[in-house]
């Protein structure tokens, strides 16, 4: 049970401008990157490997293949560094956590698209 003051502060920090997405969906995460005194937006495109729903502490992991090597990045859902999330494709998967995809390559690593 959380303190009512903590709940009130956390509720004000939650973002409601992000789209709904699920594990397996192909998404593009546009996030702010700071290099020295400059800021720019960088896109990270891949599929959602897992999603953790914990209110303000929610997070999701996106996996992509870069030069034949798998790259995973975990994002805090309500982070101010995330500019936008674009859902490219919806997937039809039977698991909530797609850790088995780490060991698959080529055609075996394909995800069925939701019709």
UniProtKB/Swiss-Prot annotation:
Keywords: Ribonucleoprotein, Ribosomal protein. Gene3D superfamilies: 2.30.30.790. GO terms for molecular function: structural constituent of ribosome. GO terms for biological process: translation. One of its GO terms (cellular component) is cytosolic large ribosomal subunit. InterPro entries: Ribosomal_bL19, Ribosomal_bL19_CS, Ribosomal_bL19_sf, Translation_prot_SH3-like_sf. The keyword Ribonucleoprotein applies. SUPFAM superfamilies: Translation proteins SH3-like domain. Coiled coil: none annotated. Belongs to the bacterial ribosomal protein bL19 family. This protein is located at the 30S-50S ribosomal subunit interface and may play a role in the structure and function of the aminoacyl-tRNA binding site. This is Large ribosomal subunit protein bL19. The lineage of its organism: Bacteria, Pseudomonadati, Pseudomonadota, Gammaproteobacteria, Thiotrichales. The gene is rplS.
């Amino acid at each position: 049970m959380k303190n009512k003051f903590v709940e009130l502060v956390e509720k004000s920090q939650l973002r409601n401008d992000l789209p709904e997405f699920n594990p397996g969906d192909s998404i593009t995460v546009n996030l702010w990157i700071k290099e020295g005194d400059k800021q720019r937006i960088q896109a990270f495109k891949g599929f959602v490997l897992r999603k953790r729903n914990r209110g303000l502490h929610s997070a999701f992991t996106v996996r992509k293949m870069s030069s034949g090597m798998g790259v995973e990045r975990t994002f805090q859902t309500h982070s101010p560094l995330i500019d936008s999330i674009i859902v490219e494709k919806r997937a039809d998967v039977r698991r909530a956590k797609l850790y088995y995809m780490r060991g698959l390559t080529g055609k075996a690593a394909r995800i069925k698209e939701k019709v």
